[in-house]
């Protein structure tokens, strides 16, 4: 029934198995990949005919995690998986980025890659395995894919690189880096680091590249056994069209790409394109070519003109040389009622970034295969259509926005204070108000400034820069702070963020083979120079966190109570804590270990809530004076509520200094009184006194009264002696 083929290797001390021919046999390519006890299924299906009217690769990649993989049932009313989680979206992009450049030019068939997590062993993260499985499925499918690729995760623990660290080891690592590529080239890097040097980061990339070579060999072995016949792809030769078009519009196109202002440049390029279209489609004549084909040739010519200009003259589209960063203006405190805000402008890219501080109630609960956890740092990136001068539909968050937000999150996360030192939930929102390249890195710079403006004590300010590359044969140019056009028309998009001490995040997408270690080394060094320059410009606005939190931010006080007192503070059905919150106006959060966080923008509310909670959770001390309320009057004395929920008896003899005939002569129910704790009787009942406390000032009179009594006792004795 089944025609099963498989390969198995030892990889990083664990078995990796790739199998095909048993599951999903109607897909063009299907591979079940197993690493440890984590299992994923990758499938590839491509349409039989090209999609009409498109000049791009119609590829979609979907990664999905099933709750059953971890022996769990999904939450929610419907008890089934819903829309993609952030993790699923990010891993979908992680798979997409290294495989997309490897499809043959001209492939226009609708292609879908679906990777499903079937089993998760709580040790091996499925994301890298998903990349390997997708690569294997594509290699078997017969679609024109110039792979396979391999992938690996690299950690850095105790000054040593670690291949595919298990989940428990991730808490110790100074680096989490995922790298993917072919046998001879790195194509993609995604990472977060704790201020590591350029040398360590580059070493990690090359370490990962070396160690996923056995995976590539295993995929090739499997393909030799089970790959389908390659699909035919007819490549159209457009060289004659390009030659004719070059002679027609080269000079005008070069002039258009010398215009520094983006909107003016686009208008000029549009006119040149209209001229080219008119030439190839003269009125009244039967067209020889498809319009989409001519538009594609023009697009290729645009790329070549920009690349030639840079390599031949050293001048870029906006007139800069390869190392110059665009003009920067950083401002903080730009919004009056927010907790922290910044406006970061770099050339024609601008980000309005806002920080909001919240309490434990604002933490995000994240449901993942490895369990539910609370996230206290959120960074959201929004890219509205007006930022590029276009109209568009506003709807749900797009994959690109999620990916760019996570990149900025990774850049900032390593420099945040530990949560136990700064117990706030932090949300940063970056609104891209203008965009012409590296808006994600503008978000990093703006986020750093907005956080410091809010009073968040970052280890160091953080900045980011996007690098590009033009490579033609032996000639290359590394570009600092790339424009949008340089991103689209170049060979590499290389984003580096960090502090003056080191790198916190590195993301790399390479579109061609042949990027050597030496080129990456040059790019990292140039990126460091650019990052230090940007940090200097940012410091003109703010160079460290403000000493005080923003005026409108909540204040949080943290203290501990005994765990056996938590129930008393919360009360039956939450009655006591609700009363504390309602009457003081403060937010109260109590954790299982007895940590109490009290938050309010009003300092008096915090003091009142803390006093109330401590009065419940603490034990009263003998000899201390407390304020209380008379709750019951009896013949033999009065019961006073004096320490949270605690009551004690003021005996009639302790009500006042003189003889008291009736308790009600001195106090009545509801009276506010000051009492001193005398101690406890044999039955543990609390003994209080009012007569030894000045009811106006709260002064302890016991010592004074004893001294007076002693003096009165000595006077009669002296008189008797005389």
UniProtKB/Swiss-Prot annotation:
| Binding of Mg(2+), residues | 487, 493
Catalytic activity field? RNA(n+1) + phosphate = RNA(n) + a ribonucleoside 5'-diphosphate
Q: What residues does the S1 motif domain cover?
A: 623-691
Nucleotidyltransferase is among the record's keywords: yes
**What is the official name of this protein in its record?**
Polyribonucleotide nucleotidyltransferase
Q: Which InterPro entries match?
A: ExoRNase_PH_dom1, ExoRNase_PH_dom2, ExoRNase_PH_dom2_sf, KH_dom, KH_dom_type_1, KH_dom_type_1_sf, NA-bd_OB-fold, PNPase
Gene name linked to the record: pnp
Q: Name one GO cellular component term.
A: cytosol
Q: Which SUPFAM superfamilies match?
A: Eukaryotic type KH-domain (KH-domain type I) (SSF54791), Nucleic acid-binding proteins (SSF50249), Polynucleotide phosphorylase/guanosine pentaphosphate synthase (PNPase/GPSI), domain 3 (SSF46915), Ribonuclease PH domain 2-like (SSF55666), Ribosomal protein S5 domain 2-like (SSF54211)
Compartment(s): Cytoplasm
Identify the cofactor(s): Mg(2+)
> Cross-referenced PROSITE patterns, in alphabetical order?
KH_TYPE_1, S1
BP terms from Gene Ontology: mRNA catabolic process; RNA processing
Gene Ontology MF annotations: 3'-5'-RNA exonuclease activity; magnesium ion binding; polyribonucleotide nucleotidyltransferase activity; RNA binding
The similarity annotation says: Belongs to the polyribonucleotide nucleotidyltransferase family.
* Keywords assigned by UniProt, alphabetized: Cytoplasm, Magnesium, Metal-binding, Nucleotidyltransferase, RNA-binding, Transferase
Q: What is the enzyme's main class? A: transferase
Give its E.C. classification number: 2.7.7.8
The role this protein plays is: Involved in mRNA degradation. Catalyzes the phosphorolysis of single-stranded polyribonucleotides processively in the 3'- to 5'-direction.
Bias category Basic and acidic residues: which stretches? 701-713
Q: Which Pfam families match?
A: KH_1, PNPase, RNase_PH, RNase_PH_C, S1
Which ranges carry the KH domain? Answer: 554-613
Instruction: Note down the stretches annotated as region Disordered.
Output: 697-722
């Amino acid at each position: 029934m089944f025609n099963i083929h498989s390969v198995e290797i030892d990889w990083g001390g664990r078995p990796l198995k790739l199998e095909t021919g048993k599951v999903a046999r109607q897909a063009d390519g299907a591979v079940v990949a197993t690493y440890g006890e984590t299992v994923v299924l990758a499938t590839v299906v491509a349409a039989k005919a090209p999609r009409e009217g498109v000049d791009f690769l119609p590829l979609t990649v979907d990664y999905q995690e099933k709750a059953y993989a971890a022996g769990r049932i999904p939450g929610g009313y419907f008890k089934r998986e819903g829309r993609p989680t952030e993790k699923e979206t990010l891993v979908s992009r992680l798979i997409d980025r290294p495989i997309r450049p490897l499809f043959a030019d001209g492939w226009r068939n609708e292609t879908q890659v679906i990777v499903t997590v079937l089993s998760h062993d709580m040790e091996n993260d499925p994301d890298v395995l998903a990349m390997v499985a997708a690569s294997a499925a594509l290699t078997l499918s017969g679609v024109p894919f110039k792979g396979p690729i391999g992938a690996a995760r690299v950690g850095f623990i105790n000054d040593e690189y670690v291949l595919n660290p298990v989940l428990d080891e991730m808490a110790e690592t100074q680096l989490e880096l995922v790298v993917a590529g072919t046998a001879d080239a790195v194509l993609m890097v995604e990472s977060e680091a704790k201020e590591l040097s350029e040398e360590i980061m580059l070493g990690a990339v090359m370490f990962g590249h070396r160690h996923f070579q056995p995976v590539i060999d295993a995929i090739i072995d499997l393909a030799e056994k089970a790959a389908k016949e390659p699909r035919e792809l007819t490549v159209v030769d457009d060289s004659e069209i390009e030659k004719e078009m070059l002679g027609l519009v080269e000079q005008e196109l070069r002039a258009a790409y010398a215009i520094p202002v983006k909107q003016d440049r686009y208008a000029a390029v549009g006119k040149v394109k209209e001229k080219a279209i008119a030439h190839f489609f003269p009125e009244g004549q039967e067209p020889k070519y498809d319009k989409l084909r001519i538009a594609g040739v023009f697009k290729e010519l645009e790329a070549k003109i920009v690349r030639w200009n840079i390599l031949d003259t050293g001048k870029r589209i906006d007139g800069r040389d390869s190392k110059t960063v665009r003009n920067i203006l950083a401002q903080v405190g730009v919004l009056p009622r927010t907790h922290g805000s910044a406006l970061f402008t770099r050339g024609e890219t601008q980000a309005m970034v806002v920080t909001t501080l919240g309490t434990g109630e604002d933490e995000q609960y994240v449901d993942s295969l490895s369990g539910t956890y609370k996230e206290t740092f959120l960074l959201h990136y929004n890219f509205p259509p007006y930022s590029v001068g276009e109209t568009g539909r506003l709807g749900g968050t797009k994959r690109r926005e999620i990916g760019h937000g996570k990149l900025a999150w990774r850049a900032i996360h390593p420099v945040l204070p530990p949560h136990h030192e700064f117990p706030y939930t932090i949300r940063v929102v970056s609104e891209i108000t203008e965009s012409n390249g590296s808006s994600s890195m503008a978000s990093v710079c703006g986020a750093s400034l907005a956080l410091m403006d809010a009073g968040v004590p970052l280890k160091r300010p953080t900045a980011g820069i996007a690098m590009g590359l033009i490579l033609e044969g032996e000639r290359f140019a590394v570009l600092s702070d790339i424009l949008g056009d340089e991103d689209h028309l170049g060979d590499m998009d290389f984003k580096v963020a960090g502090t003056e001490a080191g790198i916190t995040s590195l993301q790399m997408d390479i579109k061609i083979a042949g990027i050597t270690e030496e080129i990456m080394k040059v790019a990292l060094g140039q990126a460091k120079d650019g990052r230090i320059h940007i940090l200097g410009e940012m410091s003109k606005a703010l160079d460290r966190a403000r000493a005080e939190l923003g005026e409108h931010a909540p204040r949080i006080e943290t203290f501990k109570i005994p765990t056996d007192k938590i129930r008393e503070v919360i009360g039956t059905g939450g009655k006591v804590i609700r009363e504390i919150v309602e009457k003081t106006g403060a937010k109260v959060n109590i954790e299982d270990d007895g940590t109490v966080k009290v938050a309010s923008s009003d300092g008096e509310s915090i003091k009142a809530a803390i006093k109330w909670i401590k009065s419940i959770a603490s034990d009263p001390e003998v000899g201390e004076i407390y304020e209380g309320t008379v709750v019951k009057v009896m013949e033999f004395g009065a019961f006073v509520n004096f320490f949270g929920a605690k009551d004690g008896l003021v005996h009639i003899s302790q009500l006042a200094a003189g003889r008291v005939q009736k308790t009600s002569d001195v106090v009545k129910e509801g009276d506010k009184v000051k009492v001193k704790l005398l101690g406890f009787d044999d039955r543990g009942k609390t003994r209080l006194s009012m007569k030894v406390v000045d009811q106006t000032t709260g002064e302890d009179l016991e010592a004074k009264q004893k001294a007076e009594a002693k003096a009165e006792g000595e006077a009669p004795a002296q008189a008797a002696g005389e």
